[in-house]
Amino acid sequence: MTKKAFLTLACLLFAAIGARAEDTPTAGRLDPRMRYLAYNPDQVVRLSTAVGATLVVTFGANETVTAVAVSNSKDLAALPRGNYLFFKASKVLPPQPVVVLTASDAGMRRYVFSISSKTLPHLDKEQADLYYSVQFAYPADDAAARQKAAQEKAVADRIRAEAQYQQRAEGLLEQPATTVGAEDKNWHYVAQGDRSLLPLEVFDDGFTTVFHFPGNVRIPSIYTINPDGKEAVANYSVKGSYVEISSVSRGWRLRDGHTVLCIWNTAYDPVGRRPETGTVRPDVKRVLKEVRG
């Protein structure tokens, strides 16, 4: 093989490799003059236009074209506007490089194009290699945005779940410890005295007494009435609008200054039997049988 033939073959191989290295935008389904491609910083993008026709390249919506370097600025006009770049060739141009820089909140991006122009008899969509518009897509950015949105949603869901859990926990703290049903409580209480201190309800489960006051009233001092008629300060815990005392008593005395209200347990059982079973255990029920003679 002669040296000239070798050089010719090498040039052909280089041209073929270069052609394959360029990224050609995909023609639109409705009009091949509308072109689309995914951004790849390692690829040279091929642009083809007609002499005298305008070609627009659309970058990411959050990008701004900051610099354009063309090889032949005399015969190729380049006009940036925001995330758009307009080209217009005034004469036939062989393929030549154009370098574009854009800026966004994410940083700088570089685009490298190989643009050429030719004379066409008309500019309809049947013309081959006639680009009117080239629009970039950003799959990696979209995937990162979806991942970020999913992570933010996961964090928001976790915060919401923690808040709901906290709300439920606070709600439980504001409820009395006696969680038995209404039929399992002793509601046999009567009041005597100043009814301005009257609770909404009073009940017990045989071991714990609960006073339920309106949420907007001041809770009075509570005393237990001993068998000798004397009163003793009752130790209680406040859970929201409920006051819980870990004992039962025949009578209670509520005081707020000179205002007094007595509450009597008409079903008082000093043994502390559960109302629903009649025994001290919830799993043991008292049953009365008829004695046959």
Swiss-Prot record:
Question: What is one process in the GO biological process aspect for this record?
Answer: protein secretion by the type IV secretion system
User: What is the protein's species of origin?
Assistant: Agrobacterium fabrum (strain C58 / ATCC 33970) (Agrobacterium tumefaciens (strain C58))
Q: What is the lineage of its organism?
A: Bacteria, Pseudomonadati, Pseudomonadota, Alphaproteobacteria, Hyphomicrobiales
Spell out the GO cellular component terms annotated for this protein, sorted alphabetically and separated by semicolons: plasma membrane; type IV secretion system complex
UniProt keyword annotation of Cell membrane present: yes
Q: Which NCBIfam families match?
A: PRK13861.1, VirB9
Q: Where does it reside?
A: Cell membrane
The protein depicted here goes by the name: Protein virB9
- Primary role: Is essential for the biogenesis of the T-pilus, which is required for virulence and T-DNA transfer to plant cells. When is associated with virB7, might function as a nucleation center for recruitment of VirB proteins during assembly of the T-DNA transfer machine.
Listed A to Z, the keywords are: Cell membrane, Crown gall tumor, Disulfide bond, Membrane, Plasmid, Signal, Virulence
Q: Which family does it belong to?
A: Belongs to the TrbG/VirB9 family.
Membrane topology reported for the UniProt record: Peripheral membrane protein
The UniProt gene name for this protein comes to virB9
Keyword Transcription in record = no
Complexes and interactors? Heterodimer of virB7 and virB9; disulfide-linked.
